[in-house]
């Protein structure tokens, strides 16, 4: 079994990104159109299905293309797709390639999850100090980005020199994470059990996972709370 130790932010990692000149204001307007996702087994795909379900559409109503980590934004940027279910990094890449975009947060329609740290129950039991250090460092990074994205960009580039010269794009991505993913979490890193339970129901209903399990078996907040 695996447990999720923390979730990075109160928002969804995925947003629906469309071309500004398409004037798409609702997932309902995607009917008959092409939208890219990373893969058919990826959270971007499931988040898109969730958004469509809230407006009475299914995967059969939209031409969903699994385009891979580069193609997902490249096909969108080149206007081979009217939209993509993407993360802030891809949105910035498409904007850098010239796309003018509108961003519709998935949360407006379907509350999927943000990023999380996963660990096995065995590791949590036998090496809790490792998990605590990883959680503490990850939350510090998130808090630094939230507090001062410009300073965080500078520190990031110093530690990843391959990205030198790309500071503007990195800053833009950090600001999007702040706006759409990290914001509004009451306790940084704390799992929202109600949200997780609702997501599990959707996954079971749509055959993503075979059956429901007790939600409390899926996560622990003890490392977030420092206990």
What are these regions (language model features)?
Residues 22, 71-162:
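Pocket-lining segment of extracytoplasmic ligand-binding domains
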Residues 1-3:
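Short, small-residue-biased leader/transition segments that mark boundaries at the very start
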Residues 52-56, 61, 150, 164-168, ...:
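Mature soluble domains of exported/periplasmic/lumenal proteins and thiol-rich metal-chelating peptides
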Residues 53, 58, 100, 162-163, ...:
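Short coil/loop linkers at secondary-structure junctions
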Residues 126-208:
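Secondary-structure end/capping motifs
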Residues 6-8, 27, 107-109:
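Short secondary-structure boundary/capping segments
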Residues 196-227:
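Conserved C-terminal helix/tail region of periplasmic/extracytoplasmic solute-binding proteins
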Residues 12-96, 114, 194-197:
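Bilobed "Venus flytrap"/periplasmic-binding protein-like clamshell domains
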């Amino acid at each position: 079994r695996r447990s999720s130790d923390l979730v990075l932010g109160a928002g969804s990692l995925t947003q629906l990104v469309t071309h500004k000149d398409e004037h798409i204001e609702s997932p309902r307007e995607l009917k008959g159109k092409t939208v890219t996702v990373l893969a058919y087994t990826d959270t971007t795909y499931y988040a898109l299905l969730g958004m469509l379900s809230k407006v009475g559409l299914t995967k059969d109503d939209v031409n969903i293309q699994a385009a891979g980590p580069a193609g997902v934004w490249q096909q969108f940027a080149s206007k081979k797709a009217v939209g993509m279910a993407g993360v802030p990094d891809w949105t910035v890449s498409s904007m850098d390639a010239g796309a003018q975009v509108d961003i519709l947060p998935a949360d407006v329609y379907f509350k999927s999850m943000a990023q999380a740290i996963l660990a096995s129950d065995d590791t949590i039991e036998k090496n809790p100090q490792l998990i605590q250090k990883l959680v503490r460092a990850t939350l510090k990074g998130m808090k630094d980005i939230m507090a001062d994205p410009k300073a965080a960009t500078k520190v990031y580039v110093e530690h990843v020199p391959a990205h030198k010269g790309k500071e503007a794009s990195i800053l833009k991505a950090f600001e999007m994470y702040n706006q759409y993913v990290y914001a509004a979490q009451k306790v940084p890193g704390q799992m929202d059990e109600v949200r997780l339970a609702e997501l599990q129901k959707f996954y079971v209903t749509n055959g993503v996972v075979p059956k429901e399990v007790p939600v409390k078996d899926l996560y622990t907040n003890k490392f977030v709370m420092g206990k």
